[in-house]
Amino acid sequence: MSFDCDKKSPSSTCAPVIVALDYEDQKSALDFAQLIDPSSCRLKIGKEMFTRFGPQFVTQLQQQGFDIFLDLKFHDIPNTVARAVAAAADLGVWMVNVHASGGSRMMRAAKESLRSFGKEAPLLTAVTVLTSMDQSDLTELGINLTPAEQAERLALLAKACGLDGVVCSAHEATRFKQVCGDDFLLVTPGIRPAGSEVGDQRRVMTPEQAIVAGVDYMVIGRPITRSENPLETLQQINRSIQGVVQHG
C-alpha cells in the first residue's frame, strides 16, 4: 500500500491529509498556514470562509504554496453549476466539488466545463451523503435507503458522469473501491485521530482506519486547527499514516 502523487491534476504534495480551514477570521487561517509546510497537507476552504473573504483568500494561500480544495458543494441547474465549476478552475484550485444529488445532467455539465482546461483542470468530485447524516435524516427526506446504500448509488452515478471521485464517509470506502475501481478517488471527512471529539460528524474513523479502508484523501479540521500545537498534531497524523502505508 502506498500513496503516489495524483496524476490527474497538477499538485505540490503527495500527502493525503486535507486540513479544513474552519476559522471565523482570515488572520487566524493565514497564521495557521504560516506554521505548516505545504508539502505536509492540502487546505480546504468551505462556504463560510469563501463567502467572507472571497477568491483573493484562495490566491493568498496558493501563493504560500498550498493546493486548495474549494469545498462549495455546487448544487443548481446544470448551466449555473458548469459556470461555477469553470470559475473555480480559473482560480487554479486543486479540487472542486458538486452535490451528486443534483443529478447526471448537472454533473456532466460540470465535467464538460473543465474540458478546455486540459491538464490544468482541477479534480472534480461529488458529495454523496453528508457525514453528519444518519438513517433518520434520510427517512425525513423520503429516502428509504440506508446512508451506505444511498451513497453507493450516488457514487456510481458520479462515476458514470466522468467525475474523478466522491466525497463520502470512510465507512463506505472499501465498498466504493470494489464497485467504482481503485482509480476512483475517495475524499473523506469525519476523520478524527484517536481521542478527538466527534463534533457534528456522526460517522467517523481514525486516519489509520481510513487508510486501511481505502481512502485517498482525508479531511481533518478541528483536531488539527484547534490543537494546542497544530504543527505537531499534523506531523503525528502524517507519521501514523505513513506507518500504516509502510506496513500495509
Curated annotation (Swiss-Prot):
The active site is at residue 73. It catalyses: orotidine 5'-phosphate + H(+) = UMP + CO2. Keywords: Decarboxylase, Lyase, Pyrimidine biosynthesis. InterPro entries: Aldolase_TIM (IPR013785), OMPdecase (IPR014732), OMPdecase_AS (IPR018089), OMPdecase_bac (IPR047596), OMPdeCOase_dom (IPR001754), RibuloseP-bd_barrel (IPR011060). GO terms for molecular function: orotidine-5'-phosphate decarboxylase activity. PROSITE patterns: OMPDECASE. The keyword Cell membrane does not apply. Belongs to the OMP decarboxylase family. Type 1 subfamily. This is Orotidine 5'-phosphate decarboxylase.
